[in-house]
């Protein structure tokens, strides 16, 4: 039987919306508004074109039960705009009124040639009115463009095909052999036909072939109905290893029925549609075999392992404790498998789906207007039965609201379910608020103030009731009151004070201005003002927190820089200390005469005492005690000259940040050097005094190889100066590092007076 295409879940509300709302592509709407903005609204001809475009904007009957939303486009992501929304309708109405009231440019001026010239005041009045009308039209077009670009419009009034069907719970099902099919659907049909041929050939029921696949030449006819029944039956397709049969029901409208009351109803028939699929990409023979073999082994172990386990447990002799433990473990495994098998066999054929509060909360959190009711499991607990009952209440209340037959009681039932499970669904809350406003307006806009109302004791009168009294009122006790329906509607509406939905309620309210309603409007305004104040305060607090975070980050950076500087300073100080001690330890000893040298370096004990000393005298005493100042080692250098050399080493490797005890070294070097060489002052020639004032590297005038050889032998090397006589003057002492580790050595001296 052929199946017609159609929407499932299509109702009266959607039918009315399709007839009254106009839809248009978002790109087309933007282009149209931009063209209106570029049009001169002061020309009468242009006004007519704009008015015609506004009145025919969009397409009505854009969808129906048999016409899919956006079906005329091949792109499913095309965006369509609903022009029937309340905000869009108001803006378009203002634009239409502005266009209809405009008269165009210069009616009196253009008609001046046909009769008497108009007066000056008449022309000025006409130009002023025309300017105001043009400004009103331009403002209306600009307002429409601004609203179209807002997030509210794009989120609530713009749809794709999938989002529209998901919002209104529509499902497009069915197929028709008479309708034209797209390329994608044609490919699916061909693929399904090929799958049917493959299955028929494998099962041996292919037309004009026997079981072995041999072609039958003289077969008179083929009974295609039997072939289709065999192909689509579960018994036949299940034997094919790659066949999958899917069956589902589709409601199809077979006709309409008109009653005596001229009420037309549609006759709906459920049609079963079956699809046969073939999986050509994977084979599961090995998986079936492994599972079957595993089941067989487990069954054999449960049935045949009892005697073997008893044999292991009762065995004596060597290894008996190990066998007993192994038997105990096998026995526990056997009992566990036996319990699992018993439980599986007892529940065979029973599919139980449990429902807990966790699953219900997840269902409510992700609720998207699903209307399928849960089934109660066999032998469920009372708690599960209550959860399923709450789900049924929710679904039925939502169904009544969607079908436009619900009231505030249905909205309250949905709210109670969400509040009972302490779940907040923002989308559902906004939808419920909107439905509350619609239900309340349907009651209040049609109500009138009754005259000569007589209320019994305890009944609340809306003529004198306050806002708080309406909210705290027990509506069940007011059932006999003349204001019962209005009281319920106002109570539900007053709960929305401070929300955007209450603003919509105020705009659409046409009922009596009760004192409680006026008080609710004032409270709503106060709540809105307080909301803006809170938003401003929140924004200021966020800005203050940002500044605090930035200040904290800046303090952290400064602290990191200071910490890094301190660490670098300590490392620098430690390096200076190590270099000073190494330079002192590597000083050449007093030679034993000639180039042979002799003696040893400063002992480690003297260097440790020097490092731990806190005053100048203690450090100098530590170095003096560590020197070998015996007469046999003083043949070339005097003790004063050796002390001077030590001072030069301290000067070269210590700075003002190293140690306070080294300041006397740095301040007294020049004086000590001069006083340490009194005999050489008068005997130095002019050339010699010039040379003695030089502070240069020892590598000047000395080859690198000779310098390294002299350093290795502890021999003093001096720069060669031709043509000068030293007489009895002893050359300046070499200070700094001795050549070990490529240390730099300097010649330090003070200029001498002639």
Curated annotation (Swiss-Prot):
Subcellular location field: Virion
Keywords from the UniProt entry: Capsid protein, Virion
Biased composition (Polar residues): 713-730
Primary subcellular site in the record, as a coarse category: virion
Membership in a protein family: Belongs to the virgaviridae capsid protein family.
UniProt function note: Minor capsid protein involved in virus transmission by the vector.
Note: This protein is translated as a fusion protein by episodic readthrough of the termination codon at the end of the capsid protein. Readthrough of the terminator codon TGA occurs between the codons for Ser-176 and Arg-178, thereby producing the 84 kDa readthrough protein.
Protein name per UniProt: 84 kDa readthrough protein
Organism of origin: Soil-borne wheat mosaic virus (strain United States/Nebraska/1981) (SBWMV)
Lineage: Viruses, Riboviria, Orthornavirae, Kitrinoviricota, Alsuviricetes
Annotated gene: CP-CP2
């Amino acid at each position: 039987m052929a199946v017609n295409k159609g929407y499932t879940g299509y109702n009266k509300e959607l039918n009315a919306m399709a007839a009254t709302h106009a839809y248009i592509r978002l790109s087309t709407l933007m282009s149209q508004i931009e063209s209106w903005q570029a049009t001169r609204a002061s020309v009468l001809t242009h006004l007519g074109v704009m008015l015609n475009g506004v009145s025919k904007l969009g397409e009505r009957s854009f969808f129906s039960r048999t016409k899919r939303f956006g079906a005329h486009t091949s792109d499913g992501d095309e965006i369509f705009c609903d022009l029937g929304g309340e905000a869009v309708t108001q803006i378009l109405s203002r634009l239409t009124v502005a266009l209809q009231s405009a008269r165009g440019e210069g009616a009196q001026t253009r008609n001046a040639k046909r009769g008497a010239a108009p007066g000056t005041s008449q022309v000025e009045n006409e130009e002023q009115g025309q300017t105001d009308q043009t400004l009103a039209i331009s403002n209306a077009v600009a307002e429409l463009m601004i609203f179209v670009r807002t997030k509210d419009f794009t989120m609530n009034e713009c749809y794709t095909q999938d989002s529209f069907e998901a919002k209104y719970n529509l499902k497009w099902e069915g197929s028709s052999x008479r309708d034209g099919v797209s390329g994608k659907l044609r490919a699916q049909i061909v693929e399904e036909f090929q799958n049917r041929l493959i299955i028929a050939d494998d099962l041996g029921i292919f037309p004009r072939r026997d079981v072995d696949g041999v072609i039958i030449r003289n077969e008179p006819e083929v009974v295609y109905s039997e072939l289709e029944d065999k192909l689509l039956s579960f018994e036949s397709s299940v034997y094919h290893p790659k066949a999958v049969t899917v069956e589902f029901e589709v409601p199809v409208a077979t006709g309409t029925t008109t009653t005596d009351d001229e009420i037309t109803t549609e006759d709906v028939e459920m049609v079963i549609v079956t699809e046969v699929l073939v999986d050509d990409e994977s084979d599961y023979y090995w998986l079936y075999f492994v599972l079957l073999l595993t089941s067989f082994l487990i069954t054999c172990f449960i049935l045949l392992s009892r005697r073997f386990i008893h044999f292991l447990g009762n065995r004596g002799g060597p290894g008996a404790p190990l066998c007993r433990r192994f038997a105990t473990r096998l026995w526990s495994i056997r009992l566990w498998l036996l319990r699992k098998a018993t439980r599986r066999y007892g529940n065979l054929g029973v599919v139980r789906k449990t429902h807990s509060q966790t699953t219900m909360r997840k269902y409510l959190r992700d609720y998207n207007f699903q209307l399928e009711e849960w089934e109660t499991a066999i032998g469920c607990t009372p708690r599960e039965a209550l959860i399923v009952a709450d789900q049924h209440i929710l679904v039925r209340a939502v169904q009544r609201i969607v079908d436009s037959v619900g009231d505030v009681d249905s909205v309250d039932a949905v709210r109670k379910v969400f509040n009972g499970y302490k779940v907040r669904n923002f989308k559902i809350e906004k939808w419920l608020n909107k439905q509350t406003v619609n239900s309340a307006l349907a009651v209040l806009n049609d109500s009138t103030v009754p005259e000569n109302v007589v209320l019994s004791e305890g009944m609340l009168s809306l003529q004198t009731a306050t806002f708080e009294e309406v909210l705290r009122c027990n509506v069940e006790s007011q059932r006999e009151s003349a204001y019962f329906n209005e009281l319920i509607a106002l109570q539900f509406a007053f709960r929305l004070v401070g929300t955007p939905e209450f603003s919509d309620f105020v705009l659409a309210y046409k009922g009596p201005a009760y004192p409680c309603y006026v008080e609710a409007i004032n409270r709503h305004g106060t709540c809105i003002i307080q909301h803006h104040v809170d938003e401003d305060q929140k924004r200021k607090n966020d800005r203050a927190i940002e500044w605090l975070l930035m200040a904290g980050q800046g303090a952290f950076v400064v602290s990191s820089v200071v910490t890094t500087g301190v660490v670098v300073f300590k490392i620098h100080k430690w390096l200076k200390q190590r270099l000073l001690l190494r330079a002192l330890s590597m000083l050449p000893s007093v030679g034993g005469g000639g180039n042979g040298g002799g003696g040893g370096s400063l002992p480690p004990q003297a260097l440790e005492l020097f490092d731990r000393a806190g005053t100048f005298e203690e450090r100098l005493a530590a170095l003096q005690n560590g020197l070998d100042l015996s007469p046999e080692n003083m043949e070339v250098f005097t003790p004063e000259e050796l002390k001077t050399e030590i001072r030069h080493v301290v000067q070269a490797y210590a700075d003002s940040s190293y140690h306070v005890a080294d300041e006397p070294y740095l301040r007294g070097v020049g004086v000590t050097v001069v006083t340490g060489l009194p005999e050489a002052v008068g005997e130095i020639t002019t050339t010699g005094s010039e040379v003695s004032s030089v502070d240069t590297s020892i590598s000047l005038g000395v080859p690198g190889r000779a310098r390294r050889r002299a350093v290795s032998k502890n021999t003093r090397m001096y720069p060669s100066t031709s043509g000068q006589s030293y007489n009895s003057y002893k050359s300046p002492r070499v200070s700094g590092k001795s050549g070990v580790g490529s240390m730099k050595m300097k010649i330090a001296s003070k200029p001498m007076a002639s």
